[in-house]
Amino acid sequence: MAASPARPAVLALTGLALLLLLCWGPGGISGNKLKLMLQKREAPVPTKTKVAVDENKAKEFLGSLKRQKRQLWDRTRPEVQQWYQQFLYMGFDEAKFEDDITYWLNRDRNGHEYYGDYYQRHYDEDSAIGPRSPYGFRHGASVNYDDY
């Protein structure tokens, strides 16, 4: 089918009409849209928020709160009393008991202590697969250097 000579002219006019509609449509006359989007908008000055209690009363209330000093362990618990009696029976004094209690309570909190459990995991260092994490500890030598 041969194209009629009017068809390209109709397509050109339709394209021109679409272009004009896009340019003169809503917001098209008011200027550059990108410039308008990037332009700062005028915002009203924020008003001071209303609070139920005035500042002096709030500070007075918060200043009166006192936190009790927390014990390392609860001496009222029967198992702690039993540990204490066992330590005294074995010949340790209270200072030694407190040292040991703080050691065992803090042992899991810092996992990076050199002579703690972190480095002293004994794998066969010549095994084919090695430990699961290659960055966790040294392996591959025939000697476990952490034992020296």
UniProtKB/Swiss-Prot annotation:
Family in the record: Belongs to the augurin family.
PANTHER family named in the record: AUGURIN (PTHR31613:SF2)
Protein's UniProt keywords contain Membrane: yes
Tissue-level expression: Expressed in the brain, with expression in the epithelial cell layer of the choroid plexus (at protein level).
Superkingdom per UniProt: Eukaryota
Chief location: secreted
Entry's Gene Ontology cellular component terms: apical plasma membrane; cytoplasm; extracellular space
UniProt keyword Membrane, yes or no: yes
Signal peptide region: 1-31
Name of the protein in its database record: Augurin
Residues making up the propeptide: 32-68, 133-148
Its biological purpose: Probable hormone that may attenuate cell proliferation and induce senescence of oligodendrocyte and neural precursor cells in the central nervous system. ECRG4-induced senescence is characterized by G1 arrest, RB1 dephosphorylation and accelerated CCND1 and CCND3 proteasomal degradation.
